[in-house]
Regions:
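Alpha-helical solenoid repeat scaffolds of the TPR/TPR-like class and their adjacent stem/linker regions
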Residues: 1-279, 287, 297
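Integrase module of LTR retroelements
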Residues: 292, 298-299
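A conserved nucleotide-sugar
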Residues: 139-141, 300-307
Length: 307
């Protein structure tokens, strides 16, 4: 199968990896990006985590482990297993010496920092937009730590915040990023990416801010003890569901659902094309790797039920 082919290919390039270690990352990403209909995501998760333990480079170690956790969320495993595997991510930082915060530094305003690689055309923008646009500037200062590529949406986000730090050139050096955040005297640091691609989650291991949160971009525990809170809502983690047992963080449930804000410049609707065609047209604009047999079966049932 596909998994066996990748294993064979990786064995053949082991010698070359000592010269070009990034090849392993490229191959792993190519495999992770395939649809779960082509392979067992739990196997890929185990494979990535095994590579994490082998990697000498701390950055690659965290990348591999994070990729393994991402894939585990696509596997048919329970929340307990995801939680237990996530704890291993936190153990990768056992030798990190975190900053201490004995008392709040004296500033006129509360300083909030957001860190992510997705301040661009990305689904995350629709959820973070209200946070960046709706804060009270008399009470808060907002700092953004951007680790990814820039586009026209990035330019717009820059107009909303107090300070914009483009740290994309240092995305492999999480200790340096943590040092810069600490130097900015951020009071609350919010990681928006979790274990998704281009994340800055690892910087939180150094505890650069006295209060640290994660959420929005990844809907499971980070496994990182330095993260104090996980932002969720009553739909993803209902009260009384027992979700707290599967997080190292304390859950912060929004009083409403997630603060989604779509485009404001879309053209006005002229009505559904289905009225003219006589049938409904379905589409999905998700990443291919999210497709699984249960999803395809659900789509099949929808198509069979709709005239």
């Amino acid at each position: 199968g596909a998994f066996a082919c990748v294993q064979h290919g990786l064995r053949r390039i082991e010698e070359g990896l000592t010269v070009v270690p990034e090849v392993r990352t490229t191959l792993l990403k190519a495999y992770v990006d395939q649809s779960p209909t082509d392979y067992d995501p739990e196997q890929v998760s185990q494979y990535a985590i095994a590579y994490a333990h082998e990697a000498a480079d701390p950055f690659l170690r965290r990348v591999y482990y994070g990729a393994g956790l991402m894939k585990l969320n696509a596997a048919d495993v329970g929340a307990q297993e995801v939680y237990e595997k996530s704890l291993g991510y936190g153990m990768l930082f056992a030798d990190v010496k975190p900053y201490t915060h004995r008392e709040r530094r004296k500033k006129d305003k509360i300083r909030i920092g957001y860190i992510s690689g997705d301040f661009r055309q990305h689904v995350m923008q629709y959820f973070v937009w209200p946070f960046l646009a709706g804060y009270d500037a008399n009470v808060f200062e907002v700092y953004v730590y951007s680790l990814g590529k820039s586009d026209q949406y990035t330019d717009f986000f820059k107009t909303l915040v107090t300070k914009w730090r483009d740290l994309s050139a240092h995305a492999r050096d999480m200790e340096r990023i943590a040092r810069e955040i600490h130097a900015d005297e951020v009071d609350i640091l919010f990681d928006l990416a979790g274990h998704t691609a281009g994340t800055g989650l690892a910087a939180l291991a150094w505890k650069p801010a006295p209060v640290q949160l994660s959420g929005l971009g990844y809907m499971a525990t980070t496994g990182l003890p330095a993260v104090d809170y996980f932002v969720t809502d009553h739909c993803c983690d209902p009260e009384g569901s027992g979700s707290e047992a599967f997080y190292v963080e304390k859950l912060l449930r929004l009083t409403s659902q997630f603060c989604y804000n779509g485009y404001t410049h879309l053209p006005r609707s002229t009505g559904t094309p289905a009225r003219g065609r006589g049938y409904i047209q379905f589409a999905s604009f998700n990443q291919y790797q999210k497709l699984r047999d249960p999803v395809l079966r659900a789509w099949q049932e929808i198509m069979e039920r709709v005239p």
